[in-house]
Amino acid sequence: DSAAALQRAAQMAARGASSAGVDSASISKTETETETETETETETDTDSEHKGSGPKAWIFTSATLGDDAQLDWFAKPLGLDAATRAVVSSPFDFSTQAALWVPRDLPKPTDPGHALVLARRVSQWVVPLQGRTMVLTTSLRALGIIAETLREALSGQNIEVLVQGESSKHALLSRFRSYGDAVSQRQQRSEGEVTANGAVLVASVSFWEGVDLPGDALQLVVLDKLPFPVPDDPLTQARARRITERGLSPFTEQVLPDTAIALKQGAGRLIRSERDRGVLVIGDQRLVTMGYGRRLMQALPNMQRLETEADMLAYLHGVITKTSTTG
C-alpha cells in the first residue's frame, strides 16, 4: 500500500545518505523490483593492505581468471601483484575438435534487425543437426526475438525451442541434455515424455558460464554479439573513473579485458570433453573488422577458422557424420 511504499522510500533514502560517505574505492548500489530492494556495496579496487596482516595462503583457480599469462584481469584489482601465477594448457585439441565462423553479411550489431536476421539463419543451421544448438544472447530483448523467431521457423521441424525464463535453469539443461543421450531419448519417447527430435536452447547472461554439456547434446554454439559490459552499470562506471584518474584508458584497461573473459566463457560451452566436436558462430563482425578484434580473438581457443557459410555447413556435416557413426 501507499504507507508501505513511503516507508520503503524513506529507508532507501536513509541508506543512500549513509552511503554518500563511502570512499571512491567502493560503490553502493540499490536495485528495486516489485516487492524487494537490494543494496550492495562493492569495492572498485582492492589494495594489498585489505587482505589483512599475518601469514596467509590464498589459492584461486578457474578456467577464466584471465586471458593472458599474468592473469592481470583477476590479479590486479585484488592487489595480488606478488602472487605466483600458473597457467595450465587445455587437454582439448581445439584445432581438430572445433571451428569458428564469423558471418560478415549480418546486419551491424547496433541494427535493430540484427537479432531477427540472425535467428532466421540459425533456424536453417539447426535442422540438419536436429537441434543440438545453444544460442547465447547479450540482452533479454535479443533473447525474446530469437526465441520467438526460432519457434515460428521450426514449428514444422519437430525441434523443441527451450527458452531461459520459461523453466528453471536445471530443468532446461536436463531436458536439453536428454536429447543428446540416445538411450535416455528412446526411453523417454517410450514413456511419452519426449516428442521432438531435438532441441535448441536460447539463453542469456547466466548461461554464458557454468553450463556443462559434454557429448552429442551440444554441437553448435551461437553468440549473438560480443559481450561488452553494460556501459551504464554503476560498477562499470565507477571503475572507469578510477582508471581515468590514473591516466589510463577504460576501454583498454577494463572494457576489453572484461569482454575477452566473457567471450572466453561463452565459447567454453562448446567443447567439454576430448570427444566433443562442434562449431562456434559469433554473429558480430566487429570481431574481424575492428582493430580490437585481434585482442578479443586471442581470448578464444585455437580453433579452425571458417570463411564462408558453405564451409561452416560442410564442417557441421562432418560433425553429424562422425556422430552417426560413433553414437
Range-by-range predicted roles:
Residues D1-T32, T42-G327:
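ASCE RecA-like P-loop NTPase motor cores
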